[in-house]
Amino acid sequence: MNLNRMEKIMELKKLIVDLSSLMSIGGFERFEREKLLSLVADSFDENYLDNVGNQIFVKKCGKENAPRIMLDAHMDEIGMYVTEILDGGFIRVTNIGGIDTGILQASDVIIYGKEERLFGVIASTPPHLASGSGKELPKIDELLIDTCYTKEELESKIRIGTPVGFAPKYTEILNNKIMGKSFDDKACAACAIYAAATTPREDLVGDVYVMLSCCEEVTGMVAPGAYALNPSYAMSIDVNLGRVPGTKKEETVELSKGPSITISAVTDRKLTNMLINTAKEKEIPYQISVSPTHTGTNAVSIQLAREGIPTVDVGLPLASMHTYNEIISLEDTKTLCDLVSAFITDKRIAEEFGKGGLGI
């Protein structure tokens, strides 16, 4: 690996870690917007919030009647909301997004109070005191967070509906991989931002709109954003299930083998094939992922907005999805950036799908 590529990977890694440290539980994506802006706003010509909370960053190409190219990666992360404050400093919660309750016990969390952040741990029953077989996964409303405060102290600091998230963490592991929380989908958001920011303006074939969309893990709010933006064409960027022992090969992708490009009945086949051809020509490693119907990402919502927005779905391989120890390959993140950059500089795609002007 040449030094220049390694330097770029290190820059990208820092952005991934910085973004993943921001609290953005579904419904609270704007909680640390000022920190987000301090990280990335200077790399774009403008930024704004739409009516539902999607955060858009714009880089203009400087050409008249240029196509609008949308890059979507969701900003929200899985987490919890407080549902009950109990005696003894305990809190009951409900989940926001899919959480594996089997990994929650004894994990450390942060409760984002009115004026301060409180630390807690999800209470765990010692094995020798547990009843039953121990094989049943606890339900989310059966778990309690221990804060060590009194009920009265808690009620002065938090309320029902207060968000609770996993404590920020990041670890470098072997073979150029890193582990941490909310890489789904902050790692992809970082790749979209980095690719748009570092691609020379004169190489862009259209104005690039990076949309950090909200609430993908729950209902999804990208559709109103895509409708309002009305891009000429779009790329949805999300994580894909990383292959580990016991998983099906046809349902997963390998880490360190490049990003995935999805073949689906509901995304644009021609745009997908053109991206695959571009990846081949530029010798960008990629994997094919097959999702016959719904992709499980924002791609479908974008594709179905307005009269239909041509959309391609790409993925970053990720292991231990929806846990606080998600694993990604740094080599995959840089390769994903290469693929995104190729997408926003591809003249053939722009000629085929670019509508010009406002995309009308």
Where are these regions (language model features)?
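N-terminal hydrophobic/helix-forming segments and targeting peptides
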Residues: 1-360
